[in-house]
Amino acid sequence: VFTAATIANRVNGCVNAPSLIQRVIKRCIEKGAAVNLDAYDKNRNLLYNSLKKFGFACIKPEGAFYLFVKAPVADDKEFCAQAQKHNLLLVPGSSFACPGYVRIAYCVSYEQIERSMPAFEALAKEYGLMK
């Protein structure tokens, strides 16, 4: 029950924008606020291309601000714990009803993603992903 409630909260509260947030966003757009989609595209490309180069399996997203990456071990929570030792914050896919995967957001600065690449490379080597 707890797991189901946690997933429902994440889906309803994080993935599907509540109506209040939608109204706030509408007002922001009407007042001229804009999102720099080029920055998200640049971040996505760096993260996706680097993870693929390091041997991680993932699909390039076409509209999200995060990647779902196949964990190199069956236990996605174990993989997230190991990544944390490299100062990488990944979310277990099982938290989104996608066990065996991890979610990595790229709605941060480009420089932060650049700085994380050595840690992702070390993690990939640790799991024997790099050829």
What residue spans do the PLM features occupy?
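PLP-dependent class I/II
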Residues: V1-K131
